[in-house]
Swiss-Prot record:
It comes from the Eukaryota. Glycans are attached at residue 93. Residues 1-23 form the signal peptide. GO terms for molecular function: CCR3 chemokine receptor binding; chemokine activity; protein dimerization activity. It is found in: Secreted. InterPro entries: Chemokine_b/g/d, Chemokine_CC_CS, Chemokine_IL8-like_dom, Interleukin_8-like_sf. Disulfide bonds join 31-56, 32-72. Belongs to the intercrine beta (chemokine CC) family. This is Eotaxin. Keywords: Chemotaxis, Cytokine, Disulfide bond, Glycoprotein, Inflammatory response, Secreted, Signal.
Length: 96
């Protein structure tokens, strides 16, 4: 009985701490720990986001690809820069 009570208290403490950490505004919502080396077809790309937080281990571009998947890429790679330009052009032509 004492072990289960102690475990329950520990679980509640951890969950309360996790909620505070996740709600903290200074912590980025996403970080890339690895980047892909594969070039992604531009037709599969939906959008991108630049991750530059000092709390993340590296700067990266996160591409949202079809169907609803996120891929991290190295912003220094030429294909990544070309993909960003492609998405920027598409978003400009679709805006009224």
């Amino acid at each position: 009985m004492k072990v289960s009570t102690a475990f329950l208290c520990l679980l509640l403490t951890v969950s309360a701490f996790s909620a505070q950490v996740l709600a903290h505004p200074g912590i980025p919502s996403a970080c890339c720990f690895r980047v892909t080396n594969k070039k992604i077809s531009f037709q599969r790309l939906k959008s991108y986001k630049i991750i530059t937080s000092s709390k993340c281990p590296q700067t990266a571009i996160v591409f949202e690809i079809k169907p609803d998947k996120m891929i991290c890429a190295d912003p220094k790679k030429k294909w990544v820069q070309d993909a960003k330009k492609y998405l920027d052009q598409i978003s400009q032509t679709t805006k009224p």
